[in-house]
Swiss-Prot record:
Protein name per its UniProtKB record: Trehalose-6-phosphate synthase
UniProt binding sites for UDP-alpha-D-glucose: 22-23, 263, 268, 340, 366-370
Subunit relationships: Homotetramer.
Gene name linked to the record: otsA
Task performed by this protein: Probably involved in the osmoprotection via the biosynthesis of trehalose. Catalyzes the transfer of glucose from UDP-alpha-D-glucose (UDP-Glc) to D-glucose 6-phosphate (Glc-6-P) to form trehalose-6-phosphate. Acts with retention of the anomeric configuration of the UDP-sugar donor.
Swiss-Prot/TrEMBL catalytic activity: D-glucose 6-phosphate + UDP-alpha-D-glucose = alpha,alpha-trehalose 6-phosphate + UDP + H(+)
Pathway(s) per entry: Glycan biosynthesis; trehalose biosynthesis
């Protein structure tokens, strides 16, 4: 079996307890343990980028990390990945700030990373590249003569052609993506949007079985909805409560708890969510004094104006809601702008009556799946989920809502708060079955297996691809 090489913007080093706590690290480490291999990525440190790679080994897995200098980090990470690709891929062209220097820096860093990885690649290695920071990475490796199998998984949404093609370097990015052998997406709509974007730029040939050719390059596409480890979530949720959390649970025994947690980001729909909760209190006064909504939203990218604006909106809305509806002994909304331990959050999920997950756009949203997995199957809570989260394609037994429609969200919350036990159990059971079937281990195993079934590119096919590249005819 060939060795697996995983490349991501950040890596979870074996000695970093925080980074290895869960999420993507669980799936990647499972794949690496199965095949043996290397995890390559940025150390998270800004410093001397000329230092040798920091390499660590544990069993059959090695980690290799590098530093970025301040200019590269700013142009590649801040200005292009997060100020151009992130907002555009989340349908927020109004927040895109394109600068030619940042685009050049993005390409420069991808080329530099290819140079750093090249000496570590063995002839039979299978490469798996992750997310929007590394869209051109396969193209840079191909330029350096790498013909290994290279797969790519996009964790965030892929926007419609009307959005994607508004990006100045859209054609270059699409052609670079075609240098991957396998491109994986969270949903079928993401996969379709990618192919439609190509078809608007050049001839797209359907080779059958979700395999295509464009710009003389053949590639496969597939949908791989990322999952979680439900057993790990259940273990963490069922454990004993810390004293402060036990006290809080006791205080809430006569109040139904609506709970949400995600980082502070404009894609998560937090201002719209606060307005929907305000509508619930206005239209359904029977819940006054009997419910509490807790929103945890730790700051991310706090130096960016768009994120500062959201924080101000939330603080203003929370004050208004509590001022208008609060009573002595009852605060309807708790807004916490701080980080909490992930294992602790699983316990909070378990005693929350409603999980409110309403992003405006999200590739998958694992919080929705974690909430379901954390529930007591004999007395589960209800998930209220945005139709624009990738998870809505799988968790169809949730209460699916349009996050832009505050009345619809408020009505769903009212329904969730009064849902009979039998219906709650049936909905939870159906969602948990899906989560177990498409867990994080199945996700990585499917992707790696599909990638390894693709024949590696030969030098001849690479040259043919160059010869076959023609401009699109008008």
């Amino acid at each position: 079996m060939s060795r697996l090489v995983v490349v991501s913007n950040r890596i979870a080093l074996p000695d970093d307890k925080k980074s290895s706590a869960g999420g993507l690290a669980v799936g990647i480490l499972g794949a690496l343990r199965a095949a043996g291999g290397l995890w390559f990525g940025w150390s998270g440190e800004i410093g001397d980028d000329q230092q040798p790679l920091k390499q660590v080994s544990r069993g059959n897995i090695s980690w290799a990390s590098f530093n970025l200098n301040e200019r590269d980090h700013d142009e590649y990470y801040n200005q292009f990945s997060n100020a151009v690709l992130w907002p555009a891929f989340h349908y927020r062209l109004d927040l895109v700030s394109f600068q030619r220097e940042a685009w050049e820096g993005y390409l420069r860093v991808n080329a530099m990373l290819a140079d750093k990885l090249l000496p570590l690649i063995e002839p039979d290695d299978t490469l798996w590249i992750h997310d929007y920071h590394l869209l051109p990475f396969a193209s840079e490796l191909r330029k350096r003569g790498v013909n290994n199998r290279i797969g790519f998984f996009l964790h965030i949404p892929f926007p419609t052609p009307e959005i994607f093609n508004a990006l100045p370097p859209h054609a270059e990015l699409l052609e670079q993506l075609c240098d991957y052998d396998l491109l994986g997406f969270q949903t079928e709509s993401d996969r379709t949007a990618f192919l439609d974007s190509i078809a608007m730029q050049t001839r797209l040939s359907d080779l059958g079985d979700k395999r295509y050719q464009a710009w003389g390059k053949a590639f496969s596409t597939e949908v791989y909805p990322i999952g979680i480890d439900p057993d790990e979530i259940t273990r963490n949720a069922k454990g004993p409560l810390p004293p402060k959390l036990a006290q809080l649970k006791n205080e809430l025994k006569n109040v139904k708890n609506i709970f949400s947690v995600e980082r502070l980001d404009y894609s998560k729909g937090l201002p719209e969510r606060f307005l929907a909760y305000e509508t619930l209190l206005e239209k359904y006064p029977q819940h006054h004094g009997k419910i509490r909504y807790t929103q945890i939203a730790p700051t991310s990218r706090g130096d960016v104006q768009a994120y500062q604006d959201i924080r101000h909106q939330l603080e203003t809305a929370a004050g208004r809601i509590n001022g208008q509806f609060g009573q002595l002994g009852w605060t309807p909304l708790y807004y916490l702008n701080q980080h909490f331990d992930r294992k602790l959050l699983m316990k909070v999920f378990r005693y929350s009556d409603v999980g409110l997950v309403t992003p405006l756009r999200d590739g998958m949203n694992l919080v929705a799946k974690e909430y379901v997995a954390a529930q007591d199957p004999d007395n589960p809570g209800v998930l209220v989920l945005s139709q624009f989260a990738g998870a809505a394609q799988e968790l169809t037994s949730a209460l699916i809502v349009n996050p832009y429609d505050r009345d619809e969200v408020a009505a769903a919350l009212d329904r969730a708060l009064s849902m009979p036990l039998a219906e709650r159990i049936a909905r939870h059971s159906a969602m948990l079955d899906v989560i177990r079937e498409n867990d994080i281990h199945n996700w990585q195993a499917r992707f790696v297996e599909d990638l390894q079934h693709i024949s590696p590119r030969s030098e001849e096919s690479r040259l043919r691809g160059k010869i076959a590249t023609f401009p699109k005819l008008a």
